[in-house]
Amino acid sequence: YLLPAAQTRDKSAVNEEQMKELTNKLKEEFDYILIDCPAGIEQGFKNAIAGADRAIVVTTAEISAIRDADRIIGLLESSEIKNPELVINRIRPNMVRKGEMMDVDDIVDLLSIDLIGVVPDDEYIITQTNKGEPVIQNRKAPSGKAYIEIAKRVLGEKIEVTIPGREQGFFARLKRLFRK
């Protein structure tokens, strides 16, 4: 089921207490309730997190987005939501290699929270979004694979995070360790 939020300027349409009530009622029927928070840290954000038990912070590898994510993490940790997790969106491996985009490890070090997924900047996302179709329909597309892996981690599976453009496995990790 999907319940989209109203696109109004008035973020007081639902207050924090009402959001808690709503999520508590939904918890009786559903195992997972995903709430997409509005950008920024205004009242809409505070209302959205009022009923949350867990938070996934989604950011891009841009300095301004990472600063915003850091502020969000601070707010989440000062509320009742502990141990927020991180998804890094729109990573471009070629830009990371050239030093034009921050590396995933640097972002994780800066934000100091657990990484549960990295989504590559993939043209497939644009085409699927424009068609109104889910990206995960194509499990072979890099973005589709990334979302499937994130879902598995949310459900508790312990699988390695795939970082686009990076070799995976034990020896690759060992090589990276000695490079530092």
Predicted segment positions?
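Conserved active-site and cofactor/substrate-binding residues in soluble primary-metabolism enzymes
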Residues: V14, R67, M102, N138, ...
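Phenylalanine-focused residue identity feature
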Residues: Y1, F30, F45, Y124, ...
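NTP-binding/hydrolysis catalytic cores, primarily Walker-type P-loop NTPases
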Residues: K131-K180
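P-loop/Walker-type NTP enzyme "switch/lid" segment
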Residues: Y1-E28, T127-I136
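Conserved catalytic-core segment of NTP-binding enzymes
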Residues: E17, E21, K25-E28, Y32-D121, ...
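Short, solvent-exposed coil/turn elements at secondary-structure transition points
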Residues: A6-T8, R90, D121-D122, A141
